[in-house]
Each structure stands twice: as structure tokens, then as C-alpha cells.
């Protein structure tokens, strides 16, 4: 069957449904295509966090604008999204992470975010069920919170359909073809759909679909795992993260403690099954943090896939005159979805990119990264470092936990252990330097997992990155913010 629309949206997650909602409010003829069911991808499998904190600098203003919408969304959408704005604490378990977290707080404050450092006593006063002996402190953003992802996405979806949006579920897009008439033809197994504008909000299917239509983008699917316990008495209202890993946890409105995400795996296939080893690690980790939680029964577990980019920010840009991509939200797109949907609708209706989306253009990956980025290997090299950041340290001092032997047996060959000098006023924390090194030196990094120190001279802050002390200075070439210090010879300062 053939269909015609003003705008086709591919993807029934938070970005796709929010965009459909805002477009129909303006009277646009919208057709939404979803290969499974609404919220069946990353949105419905997410942790439910609604946060501005712990983001790269360019994304903070977007997150702040989006979080400002949440208090009124239940009324606007006509459904209780179970939004709780009680703050987000990013817990610090060891001294290794105290100073880095404090420096990162200062970075976020410089972008207008209300975030502060709490010492152990303050954290425990705010959240008594936490285990005192395992908490050094935390970053705290009181305006952050959490919600029910299913209620949020179905709220936007229902409002969009009430506004006139048409929907084809269980409808997988196979290809998108441009025509001389200015229309795009979207091909599915059962339908052919035409529209001048196609918005791809396709989540974990984005990289493969973009590749089929001629665009090889640095999007790699990462698999997250989640669990939820039986309903428990009230423990806390806040959303929690952990500085040393991607573990999150929150207590839902029905009392279950939803946690997971601490184990990240690159997903070469679309497999959302959970693994016993990962589940045991996550359970052990949260049990060290929360009193008596190890006694709670688990009700269910699930996995999810979400595309990530090298710099931790989404790609929101036109691929050609017909196709607008919004993908690569790196596991934290639920909070920004409502505002991204509004801005995407504004973009296609007014034919001008909103200033708020300027940082997310695909051109930032031109050059070396666009040709060298592959999901296999590069992500594994970066993610594999997560488990070694504390494990290799036998020190309790600040700022020296990441010392490792140089790659070369003769320590004088490269002057011993090297330290890269970073300008803290310019660095945004995007980790492009780390990713560049892991890509360019993929085999050596995956074998050795060696590190150097990145030093913020003004703050005595040591940030670990993956490196094998190469002469090519891939990290310097990858830095988009002129944050890396150079010496009089133009080499990276050490």
C-alpha cells in the first residue's frame, strides 16, 4: 500500500513521538513508522533518569531547557508520568574519584548548572539508607529527577495521534530513496511511503539504516542491562549514579528499586538478553551502597540497546535535503527527548536550524574519525578501561591512582611516565582525545590497556585516558576545543 505525508517520522521512541506531537500541534500531516511497538527500544528500556548533570558541556543547555518542561508534562499530556524532582546524586566511593568529581562540578557550574559537592555526612543525612563506609561524597543537582519512561513516551504518542498523526506499527524501514521531484521514498516490506521530509529517530537501528542510504556515521550500539526489585518501603526519592561506573538506581513510585547500567557492552547484534555475570556484578555493586537491599527479591531483568557517539553527544542534522537524523543519545536521551522533539518540529516547519541544536551537527566527525570509526574494537577499547580505573591502584592518596608503567621497557626511551597538560578552561570533558587514541592504536590498546596521566595544571587533577605514548599525537588532532597544551616545538606538552 502507498502512503503520502508531509513528514515521515521513523522511530516510536521519545524523540519520534515528541516530534510527532509538536508537528501535529502545528497542523502538519505526520506519518510515524515503528518497526516494533511504541517505546519498545531504548526509551522503554531506559533507567528513567531526567538529569542535566554529568553531561558534556555542549549538551548542558539543551538538558536544562528540557528538564524545565517536565513539571508540567503530566498535565500537558494528560497522563501521570510519575515525575519526581528530588535531585540526582553521583556517588563517589573512593578517594580516586573525589577530586575529579569536584573539578567536573566546577565545569558544570561554569555553564549555569546548579550543582554542588556534598561530603559523606551530607550525603548520608540526605539519604540515610546508604552505607556510610562506602560513600566518600557525591555531586548533587537538586533540579534533576526521574520519571516513568513508558508513561512519558505513550503520553506523547497518544497526544500525537489525537492531533491527527497516522501510525504504522511493526513496519521496518528498509531503504530511503531520493527522487528528482524532491520527495523521499521510504521503502518497507509492505508499504511505500512518500514525503518531502523524513525524520530518523531510529535509535539502535540508525547506523545500519544510514549506511544503507549512503552515510557511514560513527554510531555504535551499546547494550545496557536493568533490573527491578519487588516493591519495598520508601527508601529514597533521588536518582543515583556512580562516578566509577555507569551504575544507576532509583526507587519507582510503586516501590521497586530499578537499577542497572553498570555494565556496558558494545553490541554487534541486536541482542537485548541479559547475562548472569553482568547481573551479579550489578547486584553486588548496589548491595555495597544501599543497606539491606541484598535481601530484596528481583522481579525481572531486561537489556536495551542505544547508539553512542565518540564524543558522547547525539547527531542531530540533515543528511541530505530530505532526511533529518536525530540519533546517538548515548544512553541519556530520555531527559532531552521532549525539547529535541520541539526543536526538530521547529526546524522542519521553519526551515532553519534552531541555535540550540548547533553543537550536534554531523560535520564534527569529518576527516579522520568518519573514515576510521568502527563499532568493533574502538568502543571495546574505551569501555574496557572502566574496570581498571580503580582496580589497578593500591594508593589512598588523591590524584595519583592512575599511574601506570609506560609501554616501553626502557623508561628513559620516552622520558618515563608522561603527563599530558590540559587547559581546564577549554576542556569540555568530551573524551575525544581518549577515543582518538583507542581508534588509532586499537590493537595495542586492547592488548595492554596502558595509560598516561592528563594533568590540569591549575587544579592538580589527574584524568585517565587510554594511550600508548605514540609520536603521532592523535589526541591533539582529535581535540576540537584547543584544550591540549603544546610546547615550543608544537608537540603535546608533557
Predicted regions and their residues:
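Dinucleotide-binding Rossmann-like beta1-alpha1 core, especially the glycine-rich loop
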Residues: 48-126, 246, 277, 285-287
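Helical element adjacent to the flavin cofactor pocket in flavoenzyme catalytic cores
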Residues: 139-194
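C-terminal catalytic lobe of FAD-dependent flavoproteins
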Residues: 149, 288-383
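Active-site lid/adjacent beta-loop-alpha segment flanking the redox-cofactor pocket in flavoenzymes
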Residues: 231-325
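Iron-sulfur cluster-binding cysteine motifs and their immediate structural context
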Residues: 399, 405-408, 432-453, 472-494
Amino acid at each position: 500500500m502507498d502512503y503520502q505525508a508531509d513528514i515521515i517520522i521513523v522511530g516510536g521512541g521519545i524523540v519520534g513521538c515528541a516530534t510527532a506531537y509538536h508537528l501535529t500541534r502545528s497542523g502538519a500531516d505526520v506519518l510515524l513508522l515503528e518497526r516494533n511497538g511504541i517505546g519498545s527500544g531504548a526509551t522503554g528500556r531506559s533507567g528513567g533518569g531526567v538529569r542535566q548533570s554529568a553531561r558534556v558541556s555542549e549538551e548542558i543547555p539543551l538538558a536544562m531547557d528540557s528538564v524545565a518542561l517536565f513539571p508540567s508534562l503530566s498535565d500537558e499530556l494528560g497522563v501521570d508520568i510519575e515525575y519526581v524532582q528530588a535531585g540526582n546524586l553521583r556517588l563517589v566511593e573512593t578517594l580516586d574519584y573525589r577530586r575529579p568529581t569536584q573539578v567536573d562540578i566546577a565545569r558544570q557550574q561554569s555553564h549555569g548548572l546548579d550543582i554542588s559537592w556534598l561530603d559523606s555526612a551530607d550525603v548520608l543525612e540526605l539519604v540515610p539508607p546508604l552505607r556510610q563506609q562506602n560513600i566518600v561524597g557525591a555531586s548533587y543537582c537538586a533540579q534533576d529527577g526521574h520519571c516513568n519512561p513508558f508513561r512519558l513516551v505513550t503520553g506523547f504518542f497518544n497526544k500525537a495521534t489525537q492531533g491527527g498523526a497516522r501510525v504504522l506499527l511493526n513496519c521496518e524501514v528498509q531503504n530511503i530513496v531520493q527522487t528528482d521531484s524532491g520527495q523521499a521514498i521510504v521503502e518497507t516490506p509492505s508499504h511505500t511511503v512518500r514525503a518531502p521530509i523524513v525524520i530518523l529517530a531510529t535509535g539502535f537501528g540508525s547506523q545500519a539504516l544510514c549506511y544503507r542510504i549512503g552515510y557511514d556515521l560513527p554510531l555504535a550500539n551499546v547494550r545496557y542491562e536493568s533490573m527491578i526489585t519487588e516493591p519495598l518501603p520508601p527508601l529514597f526519592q533521588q536518582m543515583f549514579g556512580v562516578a566509577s561506573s555507569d551504575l544507576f538506581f532509583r526507587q519507582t513510585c510503586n516501590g521497586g528499586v530499578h537499577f542497572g547500567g553498570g555494565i556496558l557492552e558494545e553490541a554487534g547484534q541486536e541482542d537485548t538478553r541479559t547475562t548472569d555475570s553482568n547481573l551479579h556484578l550489578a547486584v553486588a555493586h548496589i548491595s555495597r551502597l544501599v543497606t539491606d537491599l541484598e535481601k530484596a527479591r528481583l522481579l525481572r531483568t531486561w537489556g536495551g540497546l542505544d547508539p553512542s557517539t565518540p564524543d558522547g553527544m547525539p547527531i542531530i542534522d540533515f543528511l541530505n535535503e530530505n532526511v533529518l537524523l536525530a540519533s546517538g543519545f548515548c544512553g541519556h536521551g530520555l531527559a532531552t527527548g521532549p525539547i529535541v522533539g520541539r526543536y526538530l518540529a521547529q526546524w522542519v516547519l521553519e526551515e532553519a536550524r534552531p541555535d540550540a541544536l548547533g553543537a550536534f551537527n554531523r560535520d564534527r566527525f569529518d576527516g579522520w574519525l568518519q573514515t576510521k570509526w568502527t563499532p568493533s574494537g574502538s568502543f571495546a577499547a574505551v569501555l574496557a578501561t572502566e574496570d581498571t580505573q580503580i582496580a589497578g591502584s593500591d594508593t589512598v592518596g588523591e590524584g595519583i591512582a592512575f599511574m601506570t608503567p609506560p609501554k616501553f621497557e626502557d623508561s628513559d626511551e620516552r622520558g618515563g611516565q608522561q603527563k599530558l597538560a590540559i587547559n581546564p578552561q577549554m576542556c569540555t570533558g568530551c573524551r575525544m582525545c581518549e577515543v582518538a587514541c583507542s581508534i588509532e592504536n586499537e590493537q595495542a590498546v586492547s592488548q595492554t590497556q596502558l595509560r598516561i596521566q592528563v594533568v590540569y595544571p591549575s587544579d592538580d587533577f589527574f584524568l585517565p585516558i587510554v594511550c600508548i605514548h605514540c609520536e603521532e599525537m592523535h589526541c591533539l588532532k582529535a581535540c576540537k576545543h584547543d584544550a591540549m597544551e603544546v610546547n615550543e616545538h608544537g608537540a603535546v606538552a608533557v
